[in-house]
Amino acid sequence: MNLHEYQAKQLFARYGLPAPTGYACTTPREAEEAASKIGAGPWVVKCQVHAGGRGKAGGVKVVNSKEDIRAFAENWLGKRLVTYQTDASGQPVNQILVEAATDIDKELYLGAVVDRGTRRVVFMASTEGGVEIEKVAEETPHLIHKMALDPLTGPQPYQGRELAFKLGLTGKQVGQFTKIFMGLATLFLERDLALVEINPLVVTKQGDLVCLDGKLTADGNALFRQSDLREMRDPSQEDSREAHAAQWELNYVALEGNIGCMVNGAGLAMGTMDIVKLSGGQPANFLDVGGGATKERVTEAFKIILSDDAVKAVFVNIFGGIVRCDLIADGIIGAVAEVGVNVPVVVRLEGNNAELGARKLADSGLNIIAATSLSDAAQRVVAAAEGK
């Protein structure tokens, strides 16, 4: 789950990380009042969306008057910001962050992720701040310095000092960086984060370190014990179908094809998309209904898949292990009848009571095609999507 920049900076403040004074505003009037609270300009105004590349898209601007702040807010609030990280429709701008401008001398990068290879939280620091870290990793990987946290001892001040020296910091900056490192590591661990980035972490012309931007991603599997982070969720920034799926504990990711896929099990779902591609089709989504493929969940899954106007056929691929295939077939028949599916549905059942399930599908009288194998199902659904 992603957080907005202003939410990230609220958390930074709780953990003692320095950031510019700022306020999130939902109206042009609030934006003007925020400037008065901050004090004399210049100010920086930023559209709050879950995407990078805001500056290049006009979503970040340095302004010198309250009139300019109002004009920026009037121009963006209620609109959609399109960046290289969004789709063509962009993401809605519901808040504007107004904060004090900072005199920048140097831009650095500091971030942390969970490294699955080492099974550790790994910090990354670089002198190449203000640009995408992926670009730095590709073009100048030697400029990225890494530091893994020991899960037994946690973050240690000496690790912060070591990174500070590698970044060329001196004097009081070493102490400031170490404090930021320790605070960020504590935030990462206590809040069950999956990713945190300060890009850029700037050195001001006065020689102080300031967190100029912030990006946080919380581990969705840990939100049950992070109630305050759950309340920060902004559904408006999510794909509506993905948000609907999350309510039913369905794992859904929208893609750009025309064949809807409904599968039980993430591995089987990925394999299903592969064989659809191999057969000449284009998957419209990844959807894992999980082990509990009940009629209710299958019904909601159909609703989600069919809300995509690009879908021309649906491929249901179910392996019956603990759950019997005849019961799954009953759920599919009930869901198709209830939702009113008007595109071909190809179903492949394998496992416990698969033959009985296939007979039920064939006798249902609905627009359901029972396939005999995985390859047969893939070929049938690709042909159906092409209108053959």
UniProtKB/Swiss-Prot annotation:
Disulphide linkage map: none
Cofactor binding mode and count: Binds 1 Mg(2+) ion per subunit.
Enzyme Commission number(s) from the entry: 6.2.1.5
Pfam families referenced in this protein's UniProt entry, alphabetically: ATP-grasp_2, Ligase_CoA
GO cellular component: cytosol; succinate-CoA ligase complex
SUPFAM superfamilies noted in UniProt: Glutathione synthetase ATP-binding domain-like, Succinyl-CoA synthetase domains
Annotated substrate binding sites: N264, G321, I322, V323
GO molecular function, one term: succinate-CoA ligase (ADP-forming) activity
Reaction equations catalysed: succinate + ATP + CoA = succinyl-CoA + ADP + phosphate; GTP + succinate + CoA = succinyl-CoA + GDP + phosphate
Limits of the ATP-grasp domain: 9-244
Xref: InterPro entries: ATP-grasp (IPR011761), ATP-grasp_succ-CoA_synth-type (IPR013650), ATP_grasp_subdomain_1 (IPR013815), Succ-CoA_synthase_bsu_CS (IPR017866), SUCC_ACL_C (IPR005811), Succ_CoA_ligase-like_bsu (IPR005809), Succinyl-CoA_synth-like (IPR016102)
Source organism, top-level taxon: Bacteria
Keywords per UniProt: ATP-binding, Ligase, Magnesium, Metal-binding, Nucleotide-binding, Tricarboxylic acid cycle
Any single GO BP term: succinyl-CoA metabolic process
Family affiliation: Belongs to the succinate/malate CoA ligase beta subunit family.
Function: Succinyl-CoA synthetase functions in the citric acid cycle (TCA), coupling the hydrolysis of succinyl-CoA to the synthesis of either ATP or GTP and thus represents the only step of substrate-level phosphorylation in the TCA. The beta subunit provides nucleotide specificity of the enzyme and binds the substrate succinate, while the binding sites for coenzyme A and phosphate are found in the alpha subunit.
Quaternary structure and interacting proteins, as annotated: Heterotetramer of two alpha and two beta subunits.
Name the record gives this protein: Succinate--CoA ligase [ADP-forming] subunit beta
Organism the protein comes from: Erwinia tasmaniensis (strain DSM 17950 / CFBP 7177 / CIP 109463 / NCPPB 4357 / Et1/99)
